[in-house]
From Swiss-Prot:
Binding residues for ATP: 173-181, 196
Entry keyword Transferase: yes
GO molecular function: ATP binding; protein serine kinase activity; protein serine/threonine kinase activity
InterPro entries in the record: Kinase-like_dom_sf, Prot_kinase_dom, Ser/Thr_kinase_AS, Ser_Thr_kinase
GO cellular component, one term: virion component
Subcellular location(s) per record: Virion
Enzyme class: transferase
Catalytic activity: L-seryl-[protein] + ATP = O-phospho-L-seryl-[protein] + ADP + H(+); L-threonyl-[protein] + ATP = O-phospho-L-threonyl-[protein] + ADP + H(+)
Record protein name field: Putative serine/threonine-protein kinase R679
Protein kinase domain ranges (all copies): 167-548
Keywords assigned: ATP-binding, Kinase, Nucleotide-binding, Serine/threonine-protein kinase, Transferase, Virion
Origin species: Acanthamoeba polyphaga mimivirus
């Protein structure tokens, strides 16, 4: 089938845009990309027009005035004047002064984050300020006339050390398909920071973040509405899958609607998603005095406005699934200003150790250093993988763990060694739930379509038919592999892990991290040294819990064979690391809480959610922000659905919050057998089913 699709694509690519539009029966537009048109034709042909007709919409919007949810240039300039004082990068400030300046703005962001979806006492409506105001918190510059953006342009053009507007770029520290990163410092050299540029930011001009809804109903009919990103499934098909992945997730993050159990999500481009992750992680981890993440100082945009006239805005747009409206700005880049990890990456450090350390004479020292790495990473994941957050990094590997020095320590052999702080970085593909909204990466057109084609998300359970405590990535591929031609190079295994609005198994990050560690000779040989001599320690105990004896031997042999063939393992791509697990049909545990017990990692700030708020859905499945009055309610604005209000749906709901019986924290933290888990899920489902009928 894949060959047929490739041939079909090759044939269609020779046709003109105009002819393809005529086949699709849509009006030609310069804003509609030819690849998107071809994708639409391919999907219509191979997956059925009636089915895809409800999934994908490609159309031209009619000309009109500036939409009330879209920035125009006057708004941008006005907003920038308020933010100018919080962009101190060309001033000779100390790091502390810059942090204090930026914290003033972050206080506003944090308060909106805390209040997200709470009920405003003043007007008795849902608070959505974090969504509505998100992009107004950030400076939007212009490559053509703005000093800050001109500096970024200068940095991008130069391959050498260069100074512009009070900032010096020392060197380029990273470059890839998504963008480029510079190491910079103030003129006085008082401190260094990293500027990470990510290209092709799509949605910032729409001001607000879009919300999608997934409704799990106890009965038919299902009324999915792509126009406002509303999908409906039978709860019996899907809810059990969510709870098997993340026991307790529904209890923390579900809402009771007038039609059934409701989950919310917000899908965003790479830069927007990364910026949101930084804000949320900073909020969560600082409460636990955890410093094992890269801190974001600031974020801003630079756009090329050469095609714009003052007072005008883009008037012709395309809407395709997760994509939001494009603008006639030729290119917009997003910039994150982040702390500098002065010791490089864990990947580079392990490579250095591989060249210089003898295991036999340095066993105790290596065990100490490896335990230090594992403790710092695992205690951070333990916090973020609570059911209320359900964090999935989606790209956790040694190259995405940065290292900072903080004084010195004495090793077991008496040697003085730098004290390393290991920091998890690169969150553009990550996902997390906050106050009931799942923030995740939207992917591209192809990944969005694949996500929508899962009519029954229960297929994403991936549970082993032999042992229900394990899942297999091999079970992902049969469906997705038929769609390889439309996902534009995205690794197949990453699609359900990164791009779907329900969380993947939390254990996947631990497995990708451990597998990437094993791809370094020093760690692989250390583990082999311990296994051959039957040495029990924290590292081997973790590996023995994660893998069966047979699977661990398979993984070790696979990597060792690669070493012996003198092939260098490619640790830059997540798919290459995950493929070691997938291609060898390695079973992955769903519940890995025992590995945290090995290091005595416990949480001291657990929160429980004993009530589940109601959210009323309107007649067109939009979220009502307030109670219905005269059969009408105000609704959340959307770039796809430009309305402020909607008719109320005839099926009413109790306005009071509902009790939801969930498994307690002890049940969530320990490994539950399949029968007990099924009973918990059945009880939860029955509670929700009864409450949704009230």
């Amino acid at each position: 089938m894949s060959t047929l699709i490739d041939n079909h694509i090759e044939h269609l690519s020779k046709l003109s845009d105009k002819k393809i539009c005529r086949i699709l029966r849509i009006k030609p537009s310069k804003d509609i990309d030819k690849n998107d048109l071809i994708t639409k034709l391919i999907l219509d042909h191979y997956y059925g027009k009636p089915r895809l007709g409800n999934i994908i919409v490609i159309k031209s919007l009619q000309n009109g005035g500036v939409r009330n949810w879209e920035f125009n240039l006057e708004e941008i300039d006005s907003n920038n004047r308020q933010l100018d004082s919080t962009i101190p990068w060309n001033n000779d400030y100390s790091l502390r002064e810059i942090q204090n300046t930026l914290n003033h703005r972050y206080n506003n962001i944090n308060q909106d984050l805390v209040d997200l979806l709470s009920v405003d006492d003043m007007n008795n409506s849902l608070n959505t300020d974090f969504l509505k105001k998100f992009y107004t918190y950030f400076y939007i510059g212009n490559y053509n006339r703005d000093k800050l953006c001109q500096t970024m342009k200068t940095f991008a053009k130069s391959t050498k050390k260069v100074t512009s507007n009070g900032i010096t770029k020392n060197k380029t520290v990273g470059k890839g398909a998504a963008g480029i990163a510079f190491l910079a410092e103030t003129n006085s050299g008082s401190f260094e920071f990293v500027i990470k540029a990510m290209n092709n930011v799509k949605q910032y001009r729409n001001k607000s973040l879009d919300i999608g809804t997934i409704l799990y109903k106890s009965e038919l009919p299902l009324r999915s509405n792509v126009k406002n990103n509303h999908l409906e499934y039978l709860a019996t098909d899907v809810m059990r899958t969510v709870e098997l992945r993340y026991p307790g997730y529904s209890g923390y993050n579900a809402f009771i609607s007038n039609e059934g159990l409701l989950y919310l999500n917000s899908a965003n481009d790479n830069f927007t998603n990364q910026t949101i992750m930084h804000i949320v992680l900073n909020r969560i981890l600082t409460q636990y005095d955890n410093d094992h993440f890269i801190y974001q100082f600031d974020a801003f945009f630079c756009e090329n406005r050469s095609g714009l006239k003052r007072g005008t805005s883009t008037l012709t747009n395309k809407i395709t699934l997760g994509k939001t409206n494009s603008t006639n700005v030729k290119q917009t880049d997003g910039y994150n200003i982040m702390e500098f990890a002065n010791a490089g990456s864990l990947d580079a450090i392990l490579d250095d150790w591989s060249k210089s350390i003898n295991i036999d004479s340095n066993y105790e020292t290596l065990l100490f250093m490896f335990n230090d790495i594992f403790v710092q990473i695992l205690k951070t994941l333990k916090i973020l993988q609570q059911p209320k957050f359900a964090f999935v990094h989606g790209d956790l590997k040694t190259k995405n763990i940065f290292v900072k020095t903080d004084g010195q320590i004495n090793l077991p052999n008496g040697q003085v060694f730098p004290r390393y702080i290991y920091k998890i970085a690169d969150y553009d593909k990550s996902s997390i739930t906050w106050n009931g909204i799942r923030f995740h990466n939207s992917g591209n057109l192809g990944t969005n379509i694949i996500g929508k084609l899962y009519d029954n998300l229960n297929t994403l359970d991936l549970t082993s038919t032999v042992d229900s405590n394990y899942y297999y990535l091999t079970n992902i591929c049969p469906f997705i592999e038929s769609c390889t031609s439309i996902i534009n190079g995205i690794e197949l295994e990453s699609i359900p892990i990164r791009y779907l609005p329900i969380p993947f198994y939390s254990s996947i990050d631990v497995y990708s991290f451990v597998t990437s560690m094993l791809c370094h000779k020093i760690f692989h040989n250390f583990v082999d040294y311990c296994l051959v001599r039957s040495i029990d320690n924290e590292i081997t105990n973790i590996l023995k819990h994660l893998f069966t004896e047979t699977d661990l031997n398979i993984v070790m042999d696979h990597i060792n064979n690669t070493f012996n063939s003198n092939k260098k393992l490619d640790l830059t791509k997540y798919g290459k690391i995950i493929s070691i697990i997938k291609n060898n049909h390695i079973g992955l545990r769903k519940n890995i809480n025992k590995i945290y017990d090995i290091y005595g990692i416990k949480l001291h700030m657990k929160e429980t959610r004993t009530v589940v708020p109601n959210i009323i859905l309107s007649a067109d499945q939009n979220i009502c922000l307030d109670k219905c009055k005269l059969n009408t309610c105000n609704i959340i604005q959307s770039t796809r659905y430009n309305r402020l209000s909607d008719q109320c749906y005839w099926k009413s709901t109790n306005s009071e919050t509902q009790e939801l019986h969930i498994s307690d924290s002890d049940q969530i933290d320990r490994e539950i057998d399949s029968d007990e888990q099924k009973q918990i899920i059945d009880n939860l489902f029955n509670d929700i089913k009864q409450q949704s009928k009230k």
